[in-house]
Amino acid sequence: MRVDEFLKERNINVGDFVRITKEEDGEEVTYEGYIMPPYELSAGDTLVLKLENGYNIGIALEKIRRIEVLERAKVKPEVHFEALIEGKPGLPEVTIIGTGGTIASRIDYETGAVYPAFTAEELAKAVPEIFEVANVKPKLLFNIFSEDMKPKHWVKIAHEVAKALNSGDYGVVVAHGTDTMGYTAAALSFMLRNLGKPVVLVGAQRSSDRPSSDAAMNLICSVRMATSEVAEVMVVMHGETGDTYCLAHRGTKVRKMHTSRRDAFRSINDVPIAKIWPNGEIEFLRKDYRKRSDEEVEVDDKIEEKVALVKVYPGISSEIIDFLVDKGYKGIVIEGTGLGHTPNDIIPSIERAVEEGVAVCMTSQCIYGRVNLNVYSTGRKLLKAGVIPCEDMLPETAYVKLMWVLGHTQNLEEVRKMMLTNYAGEITPYTRFDTYLR
């Protein structure tokens, strides 16, 4: 039996508050919560119940012994948000570009429903506070998981951002899944030339139907940062585990450093640009950010997609490098050990790659610190083989940058010059010890 049939037979509706008794390990266990609508990936014979603590559980229909309705779903009168949506004179205009995820959705605990938010009215229902900061214009560009994001999506986002900024918007927010947000932030940092206004990427670590969700505060802070004087690509996410402030990170220096913590995003080898409080207070943590200007944004979207990111590990085979060369890859970014090393027995394959015109760049899997190939003999051999040391660039940033560089030239000397040119703050001029694990 399917969930819809099960509920219909018992005159139970989505949003009803129920008590379910089920069999579990030979004993009866009772749960109370709201009946949730089935979603795309849920099993047809599993009932989803939202507990009062905000978490969802799935209960197989065959395990249910009793179900009773404690309270019927409340039917709310239709609420309109025209006043918010129409905007207020004098407020700046900010476009929010949606690419996927649940950053702007909110649970209605009286009905059990989750509101996805990407029309203006849905955004007003979910996070009305942002309409007090700016006249918000939402646009859903596409709706994909961030792990499915490809370079072609970066290009589309870049063009949509430039279109909004060049049409008069004060700033742009890009709502994005967190898993690959750092890659997209780096790509936009290189593609958006002459940037004169803020571009803010924002996501949520906790889904919006959980009481610990960070979605609303992140979105509020991101809109506030989009109206600031900072003309850079930034990532705005929780600055610590509580709901006190968010941090604005430079798009080329930010990395997701935890699978689930709300403050998972950190600036690496650098300090964040600013702290943002939901009430509008902004504390700038550095002065060397690009300032707002009237320049027209240009999109430089020439990229070479045949670039690989390879992590060194004990026992790595030179066949991996050979395979990439034989398959026509134009660039390889290596996450080396320590200061930027590889086993000696794969250096001949790296040398062959360079001889055949493949750009090989070195980063460190330590994440913190700087590549230095002059300290040990292995590093000096890699330099002699033609490897380009990427200073303190994040591996993900170096990967995106090499794509962008190879889109402009495949002359290895020119590639070297461009990889070592600091275009968007991706290279810190000196090693900062005060940024380690902060």
From Swiss-Prot:
It comes from the Archaea. PROSITE patterns: ASN_GLN_ASE_1, ASN_GLN_ASE_2, ASN_GLN_ASE_3. Residues 92-422 form the Asparaginase/glutaminase domain. Belongs to the asparaginase 1 family. GatD subfamily. It catalyses: L-glutamyl-tRNA(Gln) + L-glutamine + ATP + H2O = L-glutaminyl-tRNA(Gln) + L-glutamate + ADP + phosphate + H(+). This is Glutamyl-tRNA(Gln) amidotransferase subunit D. GO terms for molecular function: asparaginase activity; ATP binding; glutaminyl-tRNA synthase (glutamine-hydrolyzing) activity. The active site is at 102, 178, 179, 256. PANTHER family: 60 KDA LYSOPHOSPHOLIPASE (PTHR11707:SF28), L-ASPARAGINASE (PTHR11707). It is an enzyme of class 6 (ligase). Its EC number is 6.3.5.-. Pfam families: Asparaginase, Asparaginase_C, GatD_N. Allows the formation of correctly charged Gln-tRNA(Gln) through the transamidation of misacylated Glu-tRNA(Gln) in organisms which lack glutaminyl-tRNA synthetase. The reaction takes place in the presence of glutamine and ATP through an activated gamma-phospho-Glu-tRNA(Gln). The GatDE system is specific for glutamate and does not act on aspartate. One of its GO terms (biological process) is translation. Heterodimer of GatD and GatE. The gene is gatD. Gene3D superfamilies: 2.30.30.520, 3.40.50.40, L-asparaginase, N-terminal domain.
